[in-house]
Amino acid sequence: KNVYLIGHVDNVFKYFKRGEAFILSSLWEEVGFVMVEAALTNLFIISSNCPNGPTEFLSEGRQGILFENDMKGELSNSLIKYTKLKNIKKNKIEIKKNTKQYTKYRHFLKLKNILK
């Protein structure tokens, strides 16, 4: 119903708690912690299919919706697709499970293996 563009904020959680979905429209993004934060607050994720992060985090679109940034109408088509989804709650649970691989401890283990 309503979309608010509020710019940069230090505490995103107070906004996430009031939302239903999170849209990431970046042209380039590493595994964005903002997506992890959105998943932790049970938001459905709609993201551009930019290099690296979103595709990996959303399991190549199986746990959220990916759209192509450079194709006219893709974002609006993704929003329409979201409104027609039947298992949004199940999908949100699957997205939230992905957050477990992005803890500080997991990053430490990966870095430790790289430095061996």
Regions found by a protein language model. Name each.
Residues 1-7:
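Nucleotide-activated donor-binding/catalytic signature segment of Leloir-type glycosyltransferases, i.e.
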Residues 8, 27:
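Aromatic "clamp/platform" in nucleotide-sugar-dependent glycosyltransferases that forms part
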Residues 13, 20, 42:
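A short alpha->beta transition loop at the rim of the catalytic pocket in nucleotide-sugar-dependent
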Residues 32-35, 54:
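Short glycine/serine-rich donor-binding loops of glycosyltransferases
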Residues 38:
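Donor-sugar nucleotide-binding helix/loop cap in glycosyltransferases
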Residues 44-48:
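Short hydrophobic beta-strand element within catalytic cores of glycosyltransferases
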Residues 60-72, 80-86:
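Conserved acidic donor-binding segment of nucleotide-sugar-dependent glycosyltransferases
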Residues 66, 87-116:
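A charged, aromatic-enriched C-terminal amphipathic alpha-helix characteristic of glycosyltransferases
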